[in-house]
Amino acid sequence: MKFFALTTFLAATASALPTSNPAQELEARQLGRTTRDDLINGNSASCADVIFIYARGSTETGNLGTLGPSIASNLESAFGTDGVWIQGVGGAYRATLGDNALPRGTSSAAIREMLGLFQQANTKCPDATLIAGGYSQGAALAAASIEDLDSAIRDKIAGTVLFGYTKNLQNRGRIPNYPADRTKVFCNVGDLVCTGSLIVAAPHLAYGPDARGPAPEFLIEKVRAVRGSA
């Protein structure tokens, strides 16, 4: 039965490929890097005030995918290129389609990978304000990682944005163990994954406008509430 369910899921999802919008992919390329490792490569002696950790959607390229570069660009406009570090989740997070069918919407290895980035941010730059985000499987990954974090680190995450949240129904539009007022979930009308399905319909591929405007605006507002407007 489990094999049948997984096979059915993979067939349904594969029939809806590509899992990203070509226009969003083009915009991501035009904005520049779809891979960012500022936290991993950064020097603790020159920490940014803000660290953004983001998980891409299934099958997306780089570690920022299609939506991450837009958010990153807006954050850098607000805080300066030296004022914010951008870090995508790579490594053990393979963003494979099959992992969507796992109980938490992604793999245990992926959750450990993102947890490690939050922990590294806390160790390397203990005074930095953390923000986070994720799209599709990456939204489930961000939620699971934040849920599992030590409360002292979780409390440092000023805001989190989730697009096409595959665990939206199960988690009632929230991230467990994390304040609702620090969470912004973007679920388009007709995006079936937000209502408990794993079928990718057209609305699931249309979060570009949110990544360019409301999502980074929310994160910027939350950071400034913690650090001030400077």
From Swiss-Prot:
Q: Any idea of its EC number?
A: 3.1.1.74
Protein name as catalogued? Cutinase
**Which GO biological-process labels does this protein carry?**
carbohydrate catabolic process
Q: Name one Pfam family in it.
A: Cutinase
Q: Where in the cell is it found?
A: Secreted
Instruction: Pull one GO CC term from this UniProt entry.
Output: extracellular region
**An example Gene Ontology molecular-function term:** cutinase activity
Q: What does this protein do?
A: Catalyzes the hydrolysis of complex carboxylic polyesters found in the cell wall of plants. Degrades cutin, a macromolecule that forms the structure of the plant cuticle. Allows pathogenic fungi to penetrate through the cuticular barrier into the host plant during the initial stage of fungal infection.
Leader sequence range is 1-16
Q: What class of enzyme is it?
A: hydrolase
Active site, per annotation: S136 (nucleophile), D191, H204 (proton donor/acceptor)
Q: What keywords is this UniProt entry annotated with?
A: Disulfide bond, Hydrolase, Secreted, Serine esterase, Signal, Virulence
* Site (Transition state stabilizer) residue list: S58, Q137
Q: Does the keyword Transmembrane apply?
A: no
Lineage: superkingdom: Eukaryota
Recorded hits in InterPro entries, A to Z, give: AB_hydrolase_fold (IPR029058), Cutinase/axe (IPR000675), CUTINASE_1 (IPR043580), CUTINASE_2 (IPR043579), Cutinase_monf (IPR011150)
Provide the disulphide bond pattern.
C47-C125, C187-C194
Please state which protein family the record places this protein in: Belongs to the cutinase family.
Which catalytic reaction applies to this protein? Answer: cutin + H2O = cutin monomers
The PTM entry states: The 2 disulfide bonds play a critical role in holding the catalytic residues in juxta-position; reduction of the disulfide bridges results in the complete inactivation of the enzyme.
